[in-house]
Each structure stands twice: as structure tokens, then as C-alpha cells.
């Protein structure tokens, strides 16, 4: 039983009480405009249950389009390039705003997409922004590849920002990275965009060309992404690195 009291309540709500603040928050996130996202997930036949749970819990901008493309049984570079070709050839999706690369062993936070979108709104000069994750194993390094201030092209792993800021780099991993769709329409870019070679992984192969054409990227160290080792290839089975 409630204690005796007289209640005079403002039914306007907390957000209405500070419309200026609410509007500024919505402007930062950009969810009031089109933020349609194609999600590309390269995978074998199965995705670990713990990883799948993190994917299911991802929040997307309300009432914006989302379509998920599962690229099964292909080498990862081929999976990305083939999926992108099919998307750009489809008039229903070719003009969407973003493409999110999400790998079968990466576990992003539930608000990760929204945070990356907010960063993209803040930094129109960047073509891609990824979440922060490390290579697997006890000696793992952050997938913040290359120092853009060095005049010599490089992909040395850079230090993360403990304060959760952006770190610009020469290339990103693809585990949880948001790209502007418009970049892939640039006819000057090499095709296939992604390809694993004897000397480069598919992501570094791609960025070696993207940067030559003026495209820039960064890692958002406030979006912390796990890297799941199901079989224990790098130590303990079912370890989240």
C-alpha cells in the first residue's frame, strides 16, 4: 500500500522537459534521417552461439532499413567482394547509406552500431569507422593498422585510446566496421575490393588501394568488441579475446 501523499505530476515526460537537449542528442546520432544499413556476415556453416547472441542484440536506428546478407562457405575476401557486387547490382539496396561488415567470431556491444553511426555523423571526412578489437591470443594487438602520420606506408598496430576516442589509422580489421556505401561506387577503386594474397590479408589489400584514392578510416575505442576463439586455437577454448 502506498503511503499517504498528494501528487501533482508533470505528464510531459523527461525528454519533453529538455527539448533542446533531446534535439541535440538526436542530431548527433542522425537517426532522424535515412541511415539504412546492409550487414554482410561471412561465415562457415555455423556461428558460435555466444557470437550469435551478440549479433541478435545489436540495436539499429529505429524505423530505418536493415538487411542482413550471409556469405556462406567462401574465403572471406571473396565473400565481401561478392556480397558487395550483388548489393550494388540490386536497385533496392544500391542507394542505401551504409554497409556494416560483421564477422562470425566478433561480439560487438548492443549499442555498437548506434555509436559508430554517431561517429560517422561527426566525421564526414572518414569513409569507415570500426569498433576496437584485438587479434586473438595472449599477445594480441589492437586492429588499428598503421600510422597515417608516417610518410612511409605502414600497417603497424597503433595504441588504443583508453579514453574511448577515435584513432585514425591506415586500415581497419573487418570484424565490426561501418563503411559509407558510396565509397564502393567509386570507379577508380580496384576490383575486387577485398582479396587475400600471399603477402596481405583481405582488409589490408583493400585499404592499400582505398587510401591511395583519398579514403580515410579510424577505430572508435569506445566501441569494445570481443574476438571469440571457439576451439582454442590461440589458447583456451571458448575464450573471448
Report the location of each language-model feature:
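Residues at alpha-helix caps and immediate loop-helix transition turns in enzyme cores, especially N-
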Residues: 51, 79, 112-113
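Short beta-strand-to-loop acidic/aromatic patch adjacent to the donor-nucleotide binding site
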Residues: 94-107
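N-proximal low-complexity "stem/linker" segments adjacent to membrane-targeting elements
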Residues: 2-73
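Conserved catalytic core of nucleotide-sugar-dependent glycosyltransferases
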Residues: 109-195
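Short, conserved alpha-helix that lines the donor NDP-sugar binding/gating region
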Residues: 76-92, 207-208
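Short, high-confidence coil segments that cap the C-terminus of an alpha-helix
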Residues: 96, 123-126, 215
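C-terminal catalytic/acceptor-binding lobe
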Residues: 2-21, 27, 32-34, 188-241
Amino acid at each position: 500500500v502506498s503511503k499517504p501523499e498528494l501528487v501533482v505530476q508533470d505528464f510531459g515526460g523527461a525528454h519533453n522537459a529538455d527539448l533542446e537537449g533531446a534535439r541535440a542528442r538526436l542530431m548527433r546520432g542522425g537517426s532522424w534521417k535515412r541511415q539504412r544499413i546492409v550487414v554482410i556476415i561471412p561465415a562457415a556453416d555455423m556461428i558460435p552461439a555466444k557470437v550469435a547472441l551478440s549479433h541478435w542484440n545489436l540495436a539499429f536506428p529505429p524505423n530505418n532499413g536493415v538487411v542482413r546478407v550471409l556469405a556462406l562457405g567462401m574465403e572471406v575476401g571473396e565473400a565481401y567482394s561478392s556480397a558487395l557486387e550483388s548489393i550494388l547490382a540490386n536497385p533496392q539496396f544500391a542507394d542505401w547509406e551504409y554497409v556494416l561488415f560483421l564477422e562470425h567470431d566478433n561480439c560487438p556491444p548492443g549499442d555498437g552500431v548506434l555509436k559508430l553511426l554517431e561517429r560517422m555523423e561527426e566525421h564526414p571526412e572518414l569513409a569507415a569507422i570500426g569498433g576496437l578489437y584485438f587479434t586473438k591470443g595472449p599477445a594480441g594487438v589492437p586492429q588499428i593498422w598503421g600510422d597515417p602520420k608516417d610518410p612511409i606506408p605502414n600497417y603497424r598496430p597503433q595504441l588504443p585510446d583508453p579514453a574511448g576516442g577515435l584513432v585514425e589509422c591506415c586500415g581497419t580489421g573487418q570484424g565490426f566496421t561501418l563503411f559509407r556505401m558510396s565509397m564502393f561506387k567509386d570507379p577508380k577503386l580496384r576490383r575486387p575490393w577485398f582479396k587475400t594474397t600471399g603477402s596481405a590479408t583481405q582488409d589490408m589489400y583493400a585499404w592499400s588501394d582505398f587510401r591511395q584514392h583519398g579514403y580515410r578510416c579510424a577505430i572508435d575505442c569506445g566501441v569494445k568488441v570481443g574476438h571469440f576463439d571457439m576451439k582454442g586455437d590461440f589458447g583456451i577454448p571458448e575464450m573471448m579475446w
